[in-house]
Amino acid sequence: MLDTRNVYETHIGTFKNSISPKTTNFREFPKWVKKLKSKIDTDQKVAMFCTGGIRCEKASSLMKKEGFKNVYQLKGGILNYFADVNENDSMWEGECFVFDDRVSLDHNLAKGSYDLCHGCRMPINSSDKKSKQYVLSLIHISEPTRRSY
C-alpha cells in the first residue's frame, strides 16, 4: 500500500505496513516515482491511498504514464474508508490529517487530537506542546516592554 500523502500527514496516521514516499509536498512525488521505477517491476500491483481520493487520481495517472501497469486506489480515500469500515476491523493506525480547522479526524470522523502550530504550520499534539521548543504565542515582546506590564 502506497501512502501518497505528505510526510507530516503520515506521522499522524497511516495504514499498517504502508509505504510512504516521505515527500514534503506532492510536487516531489513524480521524482519519487521515477526512483521507484528503477527499484520495482512496473508489472507489480500498486495500491495507493490518500485523504479523499484527489491526490490518488493524480498519482495513479502519473504512475501509469511512467509505465506502471497495475495501479489501484482506495475509492473515496481514507475518509470514505473511515465511514465504511468499523474501527475494530480497521487496518488504520492513528488519525487522519485534513486541510481545514479540524486538523485531524479520528476513525469516527470526529475532530482529532491535533492542532496546527502557528509558527511552522505543522500538526502538533499535546506532547509536542510540552516541548521546550514549543512557544504558545508568536508575539514576541521586547524585554523593556515586558517589564512595563
At which residue positions do the language-model features occur?
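Short linker/helix segments within small regulatory modules
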Residues: D128-S137
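Residue-level detector of conserved catalytic or cofactor/ligand-binding positions
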Residues: I139-T145, Y149
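Positively charged, proline/Ser/Thr-rich regional signature most characteristic
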Residues: M1-Q44
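Redox cofactor-anchoring modules in respiratory/redox and cofactor-processing assemblies
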Residues: K64, K75-G119
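Short, non-ligating residues that shape and space the ligands of small metal-coordination modules
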Residues: S126-S127, R147
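C-terminal accessory/binding modules appended to enzymatic or scaffolding proteins
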Residues: L116-I124, K130
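Short cysteine-rich clusters marking metal-coordination/redox-active sites
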Residues: C117-C120, L136-H140
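Catalytic cysteine-centered active loop of the rhodanese-like fold, especially the PTP/DSP P-loop
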Residues: W32-Y81
